[in-house]
């Protein structure tokens, strides 16, 4: 049988279609749905004859001259196809460590600590039931969380406003992935052979060199990566780690302004004189403006979500379910150890670590995120599935024990989902959600974090969630000025971000620019410039305002490029989502030290002054 290589154009079209499906649908639910369907198909297929086992154990040999690699289909999936999955995981880890959630160590401290506890306690509980023998080597099965399944389950059974919980679980999952990858590298490598390993390292160095030489053709990288994979396979190191190592080598950075401008110039040149040279130059210019990490992540993520992981589940989740199989699993310390580790270990480890840290450092949990919600999310983290089944294949040689382990993984996933649902419903009963949310300010004003005009201890507070490109926010600045003039030092005014990307394409960049200016002590000057020119907020214009203010332009541009303060904008947007408002400007006002109430109705100066006077009178302030 001859297999022709798909053309790059065909692959791009397929990737684009998969990405379109992902973008037009709730991708958490959809990817989890693909995985669930594949699991059910595997279970049905495995129980209707012998074709399941015979198909996945079909030998496939790749031979070049006298050299060959022969694996059955299942191991081509587990050792070969899953390399792409781990490559995408590596890209995500590198991105989060460089420009994502894990760059802010204080922000990530709670989920990182929770992830460590969620790795350690399940392994300890597993080893209590399986202290020795072949079963003990499978302790790695219980340490990992299946991000796709967990986020899908969270979307289905989670709380009404799960935005902050989702961010918490995502951050925890990235740390969890790092731990699982390290575990595979250090504990599941057998018969290490140094010669092939050195060749594999040479392959990684070649990829670094290709990047330095600015080689952009994917074929060159594919050839070197394939050779590196073979070298690692022959060395005894699990070859899927090649995907992780290559991903960690590739650079990730926010788009550089100079390269974006250069790409625009090349595109204009092609439009004015369309020819192959300009077309190629424009294409390369656009590619270089975006880091290779983000381009590859965007390209390959749909493949892993909708093809690779479901195929892996189809190849690994098939268990022949008979009365004897279930009876063996019910008596098996291995199966019970997996259930205990994933269900109890994850729930107790993550929840207890979070509770302890939040007790030692009050305010470390994001506002609106309760410990009962974290308990529900921790229960869902017991859905190990993908990497759990992957480690079953690495750790257990006996087919009988492997079947018991798979039953344990599947059982734990079901119990974890039901337990998570029950904990979320219990949380809703103890802390019933109100019909109308966000009537009071969710996150209290923090003078050390928020942007304040006026004394921090002023008796009255006015908070605005605004958008620098919003014409209504711009007009409201006059009202705010009059309100501040009326109350003087008795009022503190707080500005928070809510860029409306759908209607204001420059608002997010303007918000980032204001935060970059704040880092140099010039937030309010930039704030005033941006609102005074709300109809002129292109990047060049904003950089011009920064220059007028005398900012350190190198530092200003670098802070924006690296997204150093993006998390501040994200926090403000999460406030809006959790409080169920989408419009700007949105005001909260009241006496300082009380629950600030959301203002509805006109926001002219006279109305805001009257409302603040009423709040002062109600509080009994002088």
Swiss-Prot record:
Under catalytic activity, the entry for this protein gives:
Na(+)(in) + 2 H(+)(out) = Na(+)(out) + 2 H(+)(in)
Q: Which domain of life is it from?
A: Bacteria
Q: Which GO terms describe its cellular component?
A: plasma membrane
Keyword list (alphabetical) reads:
Antiport, Cell membrane, Ion transport, Membrane, Sodium, Sodium transport, Transmembrane, Transmembrane helix, Transport
Keyword Repeat on entry: no
Q: What is its main location?
A: membrane
Q: How does it sit in the membrane?
A: Multi-pass membrane protein
Which GO biological process annotations does it have? regulation of pH
Region (Na(+)/H(+) antiporter NhaA), start-end ranges: 1-429
Q: Which Gene3D superfamilies match?
A: Glutaredoxin, Na+/H+ antiporter like domain
Entry's localization field = Cell membrane
The cysteines covalently paired via disulfide bonds are none
Q: Where in the numbering of this chain does the Thioredoxin domain appear?
A: 430-617
Family membership noted in the UniProt record: In the N-terminal section; belongs to the NhaA Na(+)/H(+) (TC 2.A.33) antiporter family.
Q: What's the protein here called? A: Na(+)/H(+) antiporter NhaA 1
Q: Which organism is it from?
A: Rhodococcus jostii (strain RHA1)
């Amino acid at each position: 049988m001859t297999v022709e290589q798909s053309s790059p154009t065909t692959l791009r079209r397929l990737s684009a279609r998969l990405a379109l499906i992902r973008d037009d649908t709730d991708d958490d639910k959809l990817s989890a749905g693909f995985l669930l369907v594949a699991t059910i198909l595997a279970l049905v297929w495995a129980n209707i004859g012998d074709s399941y086992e015979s198909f996945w154990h079909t030998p496939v040999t790749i031979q070049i001259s006298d050299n060959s690699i022969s694996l059955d289909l299942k191991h081509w999936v587990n050792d070969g196809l899953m390399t792409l999955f781990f490559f995408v995981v590596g890209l995500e880890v590198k991105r989060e460590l460089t420009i994502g959630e894990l760059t802010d160590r204080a922000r990530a401290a709670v989920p990182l600590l929770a992830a460590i506890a969620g790795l350690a306690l399940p392994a300890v509980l597993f080893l209590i039931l399986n202290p020795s023998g072949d079963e003990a080597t499978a302790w790695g099965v219980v340490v990992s969380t299946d991000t796709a399944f967990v986020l899908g389950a969270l979307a289905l059974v989670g709380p009404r406003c799960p935005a902050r919980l989702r961010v918490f679980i995502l951050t925890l999952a990235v740390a969890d992935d790092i731990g699982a990858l390290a575990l595979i590298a250090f504990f599941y490598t057998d018969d290490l052979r140094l010669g092939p390993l050195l060749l594999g390292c040479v392959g990684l160095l070649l990829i670094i060199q290709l990047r330095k030489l600015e080689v952009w053709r994917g074929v060159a990288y594919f050839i070197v990566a394939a050779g590196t994979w073979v070298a690692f396979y022959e060395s005894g190191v699990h070859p899927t780690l090649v995907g992780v190592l290559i991903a960690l080598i590739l650079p990730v950075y926010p788009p550089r302004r100079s390269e974006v401008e250069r790409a625009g110039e090349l595109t204009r040149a092609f439009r004015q004189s369309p020819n192959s040279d300009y077309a190629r130059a424009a294409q390369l210019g656009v590619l270089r403006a975006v880091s290779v990490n983000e381009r590859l992540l965007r390209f390959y993520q749909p493949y892993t979500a909708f093809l690779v992981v479901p195929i892996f589940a189809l190849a690994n989740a098939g268990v022949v379910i008979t009365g004897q199989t279930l009876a063996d699993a019910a008596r098996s310390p291995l199966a019970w150890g997996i259930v205990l580790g994933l269900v109890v270990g994850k729930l107790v480890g993550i929840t207890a670590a979070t509770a302890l840290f939040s007790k030692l450092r009050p305010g470390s949990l994001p506002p609106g995120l309760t410990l009962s919600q974290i308990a529900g999310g921790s229960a869902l983290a017991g859905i190990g599935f993908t990497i759990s089944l992957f480690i079953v294949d690495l750790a257990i040689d006996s087919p009988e024990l492997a079947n018991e382990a798979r039953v344990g993984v599947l059982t734990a996933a079901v119990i974890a989902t039901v337990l998570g649902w029950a904990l979320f419903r219990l949380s809703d009963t103890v802390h019933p959600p109100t019909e109308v949310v966000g009537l009071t300010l969710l996150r209290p004003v923090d003078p050390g974090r928020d942007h304040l005009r006026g004394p921090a201890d002023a008796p009255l507070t006015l908070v605005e969630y605004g958008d620098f490109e919003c014409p209504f926010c711009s007009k409201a600045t006059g009202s705010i000025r009059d309100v501040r003039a009326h109350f003087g030092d008795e009022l503190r005014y707080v500005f928070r971000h809510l860029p409306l990307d759908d209607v204001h394409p420059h608002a997010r960049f303007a918000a980032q620019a204001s935060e970059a200016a704040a880092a140099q002590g010039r937030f309010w000057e930039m704030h005033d410039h941006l609102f005074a020119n709300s109809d002129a907020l292109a990047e060049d214009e904003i950089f011009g305002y920064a220059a007028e203010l005398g900012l350190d332009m190198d530092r200003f541009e670098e802070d924006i490029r690296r997204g150093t303060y993006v998390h501040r904008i994200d926090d403000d947007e999460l406030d809006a989502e959790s409080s169920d408002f989408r419009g700007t400007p949105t005001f909260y006002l009241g006496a300082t030290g009380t629950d600030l109430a959301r203002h509805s109705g006109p926001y002219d100066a006279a109305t805001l002054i009257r409302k603040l006077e009423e709040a002062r009178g109600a509080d009994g302030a002088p």
